[in-house]
Amino acid sequence: MATERTFSILKPDATRRNLTGAVNAVIEEAGLRIVGQRRIRMTKEQAEKFYEVHKERPFFGELVTFMTSGPVVVQVLEGENAVAKYREVMGATNPAQAAEGTIRKKFAESVGENTVHGSDSAENAKLEIAQFFKDSDIAA
């Protein structure tokens, strides 16, 4: 098992409801370390670049609007098989289908406002981290 990093965003629905501490507790209880964290207001340009893979999807505009509607918390998480572990901890995209104890089961309001984003691969984690963090921002 390899130590790796993954990227996380606590979305505007989470920050609006002051869930940062509660979500961080679930992350840390799962054995992941938060080695980088910043609360930011994502710009339209940042959101469009970040979700570029969904540009042709019908929900793209709504997604960009949502992600820029309030502060988000961007994070770098580190641990054994961090990408897979965090995806398990997040739970299914649809909170109704998420397993008990997962972030989305506990906190998500809907498929669209599902509290968190997590990288889907180690390669994407590197790209996503680089969009929001310099190496000097990460303290392992």
From Swiss-Prot:
One of its GO terms (molecular function) is metal ion binding. Its cofactor is Mg(2+). One of its GO terms (cellular component) is cytoplasm. It holds the Pfam family NDK. Gene3D superfamilies: Nucleoside diphosphate kinase-like domain (3.30.70.141). It catalyses: a 2'-deoxyribonucleoside 5'-diphosphate + ATP = a 2'-deoxyribonucleoside 5'-triphosphate + ADP; a ribonucleoside 5'-diphosphate + ATP = a ribonucleoside 5'-triphosphate + ADP. Its EC number is 2.7.4.6. Belongs to the NDK family. This is Nucleoside diphosphate kinase. It comes from Methylobacterium radiotolerans (strain ATCC 27329 / DSM 1819 / JCM 2831 / NBRC 15690 / NCIMB 10815 / 0-1).
